[in-house]
């Protein structure tokens, strides 16, 4: 039995851009995540699926960024993010996404037209890939689940800032919300 119907499935690629890929990542390298995401996208697109590229972006004054007190809050450079931080790798840029969503928070659903874009395309299943497993990816998976989408998490097409962060999410949180699969299983749809 197939894992998904390509015609009603979208790959949602989270934050594959210099801002995140330039950091130390584990257990999978940024390049592994990019390569695996590209493999899933190529296979899904050839079968009639939808590709959604999600990047994070802010205005130069960060007026659209969440600015709540936190013990380990994010800090941004004055004057806006540099161009290199916003750039996506060539392997991802070459995929020609059907939709590009710019988000300002962890979840690709929060404050964006993600749900509208998925529903208008008849999408019922979403495949998640990207960085970081336990931040942007997990937040988007939680919201996809809450919006009643079937979710597949591409375990080796996502990563975090430590193996422990990635593993905790994949072992204890995501199995309650999604089917966890390797890239090879998703590409072969089995």
Model-identified regions with their sequence ranges:
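Active-site-adjacent betaalpha module
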Residues: 1-10, 39-47, 72-190
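Short, flexible, mixed-charge acidic loops at enzyme active sites
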Residues: 63-70
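A short alpha/beta connector and helix-capping loop motif
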Residues: 7-9, 26-56
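Generic, well-ordered alpha-helical segments
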Residues: 29-36, 68, 80, 84
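Short beta-strand segments at enzyme active-site cores
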Residues: 13, 49-57, 61-62, 154
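Walker B catalytic acidic pair
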Residues: 16
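Short, solvent-exposed loop/turn segments at secondary-structure boundaries
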Residues: 24-28, 164-165
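Short acidic, Gly/Ser-rich segments with clustered Asp/Glu that frequently serve as metal-coordination loops
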Residues: 19-22
